[in-house]
Amino acid sequence: METSSMLSSLNDECKSDNYIEPHYKEWYRVAIDILIEHGLEAYQEFLVQERVSDFLAEEEINYILKNVQKVAQSTAHGTDDSCDDTLSSGTYWPVESDVEAPNLDLGWPYVMPGLLGGTHIDLLFHPPRAHLLTIKETIRKMIKEARKVIALVMDIFTDVDIFKEIVEASTRGVSVYILLDESNFNHFLNMTEKQGCSVQRLRNIRVRTVKGQDYLSKTGAKFHGKMEQKFLLVDCQKVMYGSYSYMWSFEKAHLSMVQIITGQLVESFDEEFRTLYARSCVPSSFAQEESARVKHGKALWENGTYQHSVSSLASVSSQRNLFGRQDKIHKLDSSYFKNRGIYTLNEHDKYNIRSHGYKPHFVPNFNGPNAIRQFQPNQINENWKRHSYAGEQPETVPYLLLNRALNRTNNPPGNWKKPSDSLSVASSSREGYVSHHNTPAQSFANRLAQRKTTNLADRNSNVRRSFNGTDNHIRFLQQRMPTLEHTTKSFLRNWRIESYLNDHSEATPDSNGSALGDRFEGYDNPENLKANALYTHSRLRSSLVFKPTLPEQKEVNSCTTGSSNSTIIGSQGSETPKEVPDTPTNVQHLTDKPLPESIPKLPLQSEAPKMHTLQVPENHSVALNQTTNGHTESNNYIYKTLGVNKQTENLKNQQTENLLKRRSFPLFDNSKANLDPGNSKHYVYSTLTRNRVRQPEKPKEDLLKSSKSMHNVTHNLEEDEEEVTKRNSPSGTTTKSVSIAALLDVNKEESNKELASKKEVKGSPSFLKKGSQKLRSLLSLTPDKKENLSKNKAPAFYRLCSSSDTLVSEGEENQKPKKSDTKVDSSPRRKHSSSSNSQGSIHKSKEDVTVSPSQEINAPPDENKRTPSPGPVESKFLERAGDASAPRFNTEQIQYRDSREINAVVTPERRPTSSPRPTSSELLRSHSTDRRVYSRFEPFCKIESSIQPTSNMPNTSINRPEIKSATMGNSYGRSSPLLNYNTGVYRSYQPNENKFRGFMQKFGNFIHKNK
């Protein structure tokens, strides 16, 4: 195959465009050899003989003659000084240097290739033309802006002003490397001495000298050139390169030009500087102090003085015995590796782009026969690096100046675990020597994310601060400050936890009657009512769409009373807490009594819902004594519930399960009663558990007739059962709270018992009659109700929710005398007033919430005498509480009571002295409302019966724990929205807020009188 030279000889026109004729001439080399060996005259004679012109300038001739170094005369040569013509003057280019390369011990920023962007160059001239700043001012500005490193390469440096800026930068912790021409170094040294500065003793400045190439003659004589490069590299991001030398004359006299370079081209200057630094040497004037600094070891890079520095290929290989036996090879600990010049990788560089996917083309074995060292990961990293600093792995060096023997003993390296700076090669020095074997591997993406979070203050810490250890502790703390990424994750995690804990949409009420969190915020915030109500309405819609898992309770229409049972016990018309005697076991009942056939036999331990509240202690005698002063002390209830009853806990777990099953009843806030802290330890959502609790004993007939009040009925009955209850309840706590309706329900006739058994049959005739019953009740809308409809405008969501509310027909109202204990007038009750009847039932439904235990305990005798004992005929109106026509989804649970209504009303306001004793028909009226049909217009009815005292109203809830108030964050009991503001039923947090309750009582009396 023909070569290019053969083709060129055949056809002279076939030459490459890049071909350049060689300019080398042999007589050039011979003339230089004669000049070195014989001087200037022999050199000129040779040019005449060869008939060539002079090619050297006089300055060059003088430089060669001045700097030539001749070899010593050898005995092998003859006495006539004749030279052997066979000797060659060719230059020797070794593959490896036999001199170790120095380390960048002050640190060097690592710039990932390709991240600097496009190259941008600005030209500056001296004297300045279009720029405001001169070249010298620009140099000073760049030095002031340096934050990491200043790398200066200069032929001659004698400018005092620039030198002062460099020294000041070193005091800020900026690493300063200065490379000067060896032939002009003496000028720099003289300048520093005149300024009174020993530059070799400055902790953050390294000054070294660089000389040009060596020219070797045929006889072995040689001379070297100068280092004429001039550039300033700042933070490996900006370069000033040009003809400007750091001398006074260049500022005032000489013309010069420089380039300000940024971008990708800076990487070339970065590599060039590290190449020059690798071939630099310590000046002879500094050699004595340098040798004293490293006298305790073989070399700086071998004895660990340049701590944590990744040794370059030349420096490590030059200090090893390639073919000798390695001593201490069995000691594979960190101290051995460190002392032998083997250091861990930079923690960032282990995951950088340079490390991944790079396979060295040549991996020499510098360990000889030592196979163990061959497989050390630190060793492998050092083998594939190129010579010195020209493109090898970034160097790792300490930021604390621990490279002095004195400071190294006082400041041993610590294990710094914080990830190093992303822009510093030497950043891993802050982490101490971390072994490769126990460092967990991390992804490069994680490392890159950590680099981005490094702030400027932390980046500045990549340079040494001081010799002492004061700033060591400060940096130790700074490096452990939480990063933005970790802080954000922690904040989001805490926010999710707090959001979950503060979400009370599914929460059950706690012991004080309010949802979790109501005690802490918004006591008097009416906005919470609307917000929570709207939320409940959305829950209502979901309950309409999704069928409840728990079957609805069967409904049966009472043929005798014309009403039907409701599945929502929480909205019973006349359900009100009864008064509680002073004995701790006043309302206890037997737990071993047989259950009715229609009642499923479920354990009582699983009845109560689980709440975010403390449990009632086993003995409540102390709590009862605190409320015997005649007024309510509701704040004490929180501190009374400290004990935990296992039975109560099991009871709550079952109730929570029932609550979750029945999605149409998120919370049943209105279905709580019997607030006495000593007598009622559980409360039950009667919608789910009314058929599961055991019925109380039937009260004696003579007791019902002779008793003057409902309170006496229950009180006497409880006294009869006190001994049996104590025997069955060894803890002495209340396990059941008996309501008047429950007591009278046992006294029903046989016909009513059969009627109660029909409630479990869904296909009963009474179940089918319910629709027609509602229609008749709707048609019986009286003018009074229509009149009140326009007066009382309830919110939209109240009207939406009360779609199933029904009215009571006129004929039914004739059979239901109305109960109004607080009315002052003695006029006969209006038997046909459907509005008063409807509103009275609404109020009594609202009063299903609790009464202060203190006022029940301290009920006066005249209050007990206020209500005559009901006759046996009343029992037919007191069927199991609840109306079937009531909304099955408990829509008026939206009524979120205001927090100020939580505390109970004081007892003196609860007993009006001027009210006459109502007749037996009035009492029947209160119980007949349990059997009435609910109306959607009830929210607009008069509130004439809203002022009746709750102490006389029966309580149909069973197994309910003490609840301090009726105001919960989410009130899911069925009641009228107008009665939401009836503070006479609920405790308020502030005692003076009972004035509002008194006002409502007076307002109700006024309305009733007008009728």
Curated annotation (Swiss-Prot):
Q: Where is the composition biased (Polar residues)?
A: 706-715, 727-738
Q: How is it modified after translation?
A: Phosphorylated in vitro by CSNK1A1.
Q: Which InterPro entries does its entry note?
A: FAM83, SACK1
Residues with PTM Phosphothreonine: 782
Segment DUF1669: which positions?
Answer: 1-283
Which positions bear Phosphoserine?
A: 334, 422, 424, 466, 543, 664, 802, 852, 869, 915
For region Required for interaction with RAF1 and for the function, the annotated ranges are: 1-284
Using the UniProt annotation, give all residue ranges assigned to the region (Disordered): 555-585, 691-738, 750-769, 807-928
Q: Name one GO cellular component term.
A: membrane
Q: Could you tell me the keywords of this UniProt record?
A: Cytoplasm, Membrane, Phosphoprotein, Proto-oncogene
| Compositional bias annotation for Low complexity | 557-574, 913-923
- Does the keyword section mention Phosphoprotein? yes
SUPFAM superfamilies, A to Z = Phospholipase D/nuclease
Report a single Gene Ontology molecular function.
Answer: protein kinase binding
Record's domain comment? All members of the FAM83 family of proteins share a conserved N-terminal DUF1669 (domain of unknown function 1669) domain of about 300 amino acids. This domain mediates the interaction with casein kinase 1 (CK1) isoforms. Therefore, it has been proposed to rename DUF1669 the polypeptide anchor of CK1 domain.
Which family does the UniProt entry place this protein in?
Answer: Belongs to the FAM83 family.
Quaternary state and interactors = Interacts with EGFR; positively regulates EGFR inducing its autophosphorylation in absence of stimulation by EGF. Interacts with RAF1; displaces 14-3-3 proteins from RAF1 and activates RAF1 within the RAS/MAPK signaling cascade. Interacts with AKT1, PIK3CA and PIK3R1; activates the PI3K/AKT signaling cascade. Directly interacts (via DUF1669) with casein kinase isoforms CSNK1A1, CSNK1A1L, CSNK1D and CSNK1E.
| Free-text function comment from the UniProt entry | Probable proto-oncogene that functions in the epidermal growth factor receptor/EGFR signaling pathway. Activates both the EGFR itself and downstream RAS/MAPK and PI3K/AKT/TOR signaling cascades.
- Which PANTHER family does this UniProt record tie to the protein? PROTEIN FAM83A-RELATED
Its protein name is: Protein FAM83B
Taxonomic classification: Eukaryota, Metazoa, Chordata, Craniata, Vertebrata
Question: What gene name does this entry carry?
Answer: FAM83B
